[in-house]
Amino acid sequence: MALTTTGTEQHDLFSGTFWQNPHPAYAALRAEDPVRKLALPDGPVWLLTRYADVREAFVDPRLSKDWRHTLPEDQRADMPATPTPMMILMDPPDHTRLRKLVGRSFTVRRMNELEPRITEIADGLLAGLPTDGPVDLMREYAFQIPVQVICELLGVPAEDRDDFSAWSSVLVDDSPADDKNAAMGKLHGYLSDLLERKRTEPDDALLSSLLAVSDEDGDRLSQEELVAMAMLLLIAGHETTVNLIGNGVLALLTHPDQRKLLAEDPSLISSAVEEFLRFDSPVSQAPIRFTAEDVTYSGVTIPAGEMVMLGLAAANRDADWMPEPDRLDITRDASGGVFFGHGIHFCLGAQLARLEGRVAIGRLFADRPELALAVGLDELVYRESTLVRGLSRMPVTMGPRSA
């Protein structure tokens, strides 16, 4: 648990009531303590909460993904840069090389071609949901669409999807270290076996494309790089979108004026999804960075060798960037937010997440115009994760289907 005191108020960070509504704590930090050193289980971490600081930090080469900057200089050469060659844990030129290779398969055109299939999945799920009685919308809808999409995209067999989703949740939530290590081992082993099957029985899915991809110099992804990339795509490819859908649906259910606007003009769904990403960001904090040298943000100097977290959810509600940040407005232009990062680490799957959000939320409210929460807001339970923000469950009454 980390505690911040601002004025006469105390705010728990990453514990207690924080999970239900973190925004008062973020607002207090932005106003009076925007570069805050926190005591977390993995060690002290500096949290940046202002939009300008977070956006600048994404492109600051002094903030490295190389954990060895926390070690004395004479010990660094004997240690591996990262325990697994995952792109989001790398600096250039290693990051540049992997991004170039993967980008050949993960194109905007390929993502846009998925829209008919995403719509088919959403409509099929909606057709099977009852009109009465409580339904857990997270489990039966928000979770199902991204999982089916990313598994089909990568070529993961349907019978394996529940296992991989369970491992992913353990890795993303604030689970015990032993549980995380066990889940990582199981996921690594599963993906290694799956990639071997793809070598002998290739298909038209993304994993087979990654096996075949090479650049003009003949460079290819190694086996460990392939496993790490598959792991990243599987986890990031559904965790963000599940929470985008859930948070977006809840935002509309709790803001009837905005729900009415969308019902009257369904073309607002694109700007609505951008606003959902800003208003209740599905990714709360970016992965840890390490200071390669002293850095200064908002007048506070962070020494070399320290860990730094970039507060995406806090930055996206910064009034210095977005007027009236605590008001939901699906007609505003929320582009420019740091929902998916910024710079060289901008999320490779941002286009797909936005597309899934537009289809899932748009089809849901068009199909079930009387959709309503089945419990009070104080009964909703959020996941306890420093990385993502989303509901564990969302009991709803679906209501009759539209004519």
From Swiss-Prot:
Key word Transmembrane present: no
Protein's cellular compartments: Cytoplasm
InterPro entries, sorted: Cyt_P450, Cyt_P450_B, Cyt_P450_CS, Cyt_P450_sf
Keywords: Cytoplasm, Heme, Iron, Metal-binding, Monooxygenase, Oxidoreductase
Catalytic activity, as annotated: 5beta-cholestane-3alpha,7alpha,12alpha-triol + 6 reduced [adrenodoxin] + 3 O2 + 5 H(+) = (25R)-3alpha,7alpha,12alpha-trihydroxy-5beta-cholestan-26-oate + 6 oxidized [adrenodoxin] + 4 H2O
Residue numbers binding heme: C347
Regulation: Activated by partially methylated beta-cyclodextrin.
CDD domains membership: CYP107-like
Major site of localization recorded for this protein: cytoplasm
A single MF term (Gene Ontology): iron ion binding
GO CC entries: cytoplasm
Catalytic activity, EC: 1.14.15.15
Top-level EC class: oxidoreductase
Cofactor: heme
Record PANTHER family: CYTOCHROME P450 YJIB-RELATED (PTHR46696:SF1), P450, PUTATIVE (EUROFUNG)-RELATED (PTHR46696)
Sequence similarity: Belongs to the cytochrome P450 family.
Protein name: Vitamin D(3) 25-hydroxylase
Organism: Pseudonocardia autotrophica
Gene: vdh
